[in-house]
Amino acid sequence: MVTIRLARHGAKKRPFYQVVVTDSRNARNGRFIERVGFFNPIASEKEEGTRLDLDRIAHWVGQGATISDRVAALIKAANKAA
């Protein structure tokens, strides 16, 4: 099953997440199909904290991909801000 979820990157104590489309059987930071955005939970005021390609996310949801709870919250916040 294809899912849209977060893959953790960054350094110890400084997380940075990529929003990826991947097979649910793959490891958290393993192989992915497409990167559709990023999320930086510790971004400063000057830095961009979240960027999502909502068109590609809608495409994958139309293809039957499921969305993780955290990514769903990020999408909701992005739609509210837009």
From Swiss-Prot:
Single annotated GO MF: structural constituent of ribosome
A cellular-component GO term for this protein: cytoplasm
Alphabetical list of Pfam families matching this protein: Ribosomal_S16 (PF00886)
Keywords from the named record: Ribonucleoprotein, Ribosomal protein
Domain of life (superkingdom): Bacteria
GO process terms (BP): translation
PANTHER family associated with the record: 30S RIBOSOMAL PROTEIN S16, SMALL RIBOSOMAL SUBUNIT PROTEIN BS16M
Protein name listed in UniProt: Small ribosomal subunit protein bS16
Organism listed in the record: Citrobacter koseri (strain ATCC BAA-895 / CDC 4225-83 / SGSC4696)
